[in-house]
């Protein structure tokens, strides 16, 4: 063996083995009005049927229903790599006659996941924290409008500092190519005008592969992604393809000349899944955590925290309900105080043991 070789070059292999053994968690939210192909696209992206048991309400029922939050989980294994995918769906969004504040349940859900993670992170058992935070939100935009509607703007403005947003134009096969490009530019202009932050692709390093750089730039330019979903295999001439057949021809889901499906799947699965998780933790979650800590510094925050109805016993022995931010900080302080008392007790016990041992040695000498 080369005497100059230490072995640090094998560190990436260690990390790879550890990551493969542990597996990966990813939480994806889909939002947007009904009828834009959200369910079909998700099934197409992950080649699974997550909506097998869903019952589709009729038009009258949709206009009367309120927004609900549904979570569905599935484990996907490919090439020995396991991914635990959690899909957060928002049926009923934008379907009511009065859509005022219909986005608030989504905002609360995202914040509740941050709050749960903050409590778990501040607890005693930090090794087995379940990360239920939303790492990405696919927001579906209608191809039949002239850009973002007021409801779209209100929703995106409410969540853009809490989750990675990827705008998607659903059922893009309803548009001609020039119409698609015009709609994309209109949406980009509106996002800039409304100062809405969407997911920003990281800049490539100088030593990155040229093919990856090209793909990264292509994905940036294609935002918002114009997509078509289909799990049906049709024949286009002599070859089978996944797509949709119309009287005027066939739309191929995985043909980059027909839609942006491949770019969306490449970004979500192959190239940027880990970056979406890192941005969620390092930027979005840390921003939420900083706001929690700042709330303690405001006048009256201590008084508001003291009015919490949750006892210490319920805080440590039973699952916690979702609490206001000030109450969450009270629980954190209580846990810190409890840890400090336990440390003091341990130090006293050690001092008593040392004193007893010293007295025993002294009596032996006498």
UniProtKB/Swiss-Prot annotation:
Residues 349-366 have a biased composition (Low complexity). Its main location: cytoplasm. Residues 347-366 are annotated as: Disordered. Residues 89-92 are annotated as: G3 motif. The modification Phosphoserine is found at residues 206, 247, 306, 314. It is found in: Cytoplasm; Cytoplasm, Cytoskeleton; Cytoplasm, Cytoskeleton, Microtubule organizing center, Centrosome; Midbody. Residues 32-39 are annotated as: G1 motif. One of its GO terms (molecular function) is identical protein binding. The modification Phosphothreonine is found at residue 250. Gene3D superfamilies: P-loop containing nucleotide triphosphate hydrolases. It comes from the Eukaryota. Keywords: Cell cycle, Cell division, Cytoplasm, Cytoskeleton, GTP-binding, Nucleotide-binding, Phosphoprotein. InterPro entries: G_SEPTIN_dom, P-loop_NTPase, Septin. Residues 170-173 are annotated as: G4 motif. Filament-forming cytoskeletal GTPase. May play a role in cytokinesis (Potential). PANTHER family: SEPTIN. Septins polymerize into heterooligomeric protein complexes that form filaments, and can associate with cellular membranes, actin filaments and microtubules. GTPase activity is required for filament formation. Interacts with AURKB. This is Septin-1. It comes from Mus musculus.
């Amino acid at each position: 063996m080369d005497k100059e070789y230490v072995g640090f070059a094998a560190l990436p292999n260690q990390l790879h083995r550890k990551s493969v053994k542990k597996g990966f968690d990813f939480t994806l939210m889909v939002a947007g009005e009904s009828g834009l192909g959200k369910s079909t696209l998700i099934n197409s992206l992950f080649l699974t049927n997550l909506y097998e048991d869903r019952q589709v309400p009729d038009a009258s029922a949709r206009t009367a229903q309120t927004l609900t939050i549904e979570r569905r989980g599935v484990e996907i294994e490919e090439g020995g790599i396991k991914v635990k995918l959690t899909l957060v769906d928002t049926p009923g969004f934008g379907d009511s006659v009065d859509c005022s504040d219909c986005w608030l349940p989504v905002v609360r859900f995202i914040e509740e996941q941050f709050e749960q993670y903050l409590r778990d992170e501040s607890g005693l058992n930090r090794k087995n924290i379940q990360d239920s935070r939303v790492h990405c939100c696919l927001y579906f935009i209608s191809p039949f409008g002239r850009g973002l509607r007021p409801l779209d703007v209100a929703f995106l403005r409410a969540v853009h500092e809490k989750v990675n947003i990827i705008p998607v134009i659903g059922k893009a096969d309803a548009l001609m190519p020039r119409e698609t490009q015009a709609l994309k530019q209109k949406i980009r202009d509106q996002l800039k005008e409304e100062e809405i932050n969407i997911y920003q692709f990281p800049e490539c390093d100088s030593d990155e592969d040229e093919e990856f750089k090209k793909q990264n730039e292509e994905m940036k330019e294609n935002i918002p992604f114009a997509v078509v979903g289909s799990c049906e295999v049709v024949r286009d001439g002599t070859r089978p393809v996944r797509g949709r057949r119309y009287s005027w021809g066939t739309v191929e889901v995985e043909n980059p000349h027909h839609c942006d499906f491949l770019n969306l799947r490449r970004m979500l699965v192959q190239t940027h899944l880990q970056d979406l998780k890192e941005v969620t933790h390092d930027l979005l979650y840390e921003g939420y955590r900083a706001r929690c800590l700042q709330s303690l510094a405001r006048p009256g925050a201590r008084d508001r925290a003291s009015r919490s109805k949750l006892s210490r016993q319920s805080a440590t022995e039973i699952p916690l309900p979702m609490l206001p931010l000030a109450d969450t900080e009270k629980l954190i302080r209580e846990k810190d105080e409890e840890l400090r008392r336990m440390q003091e007790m341990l130090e006293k016990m050690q001092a008593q043991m040392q004193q007893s041992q010293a007295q025993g040695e002294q009596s032996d000498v006498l």
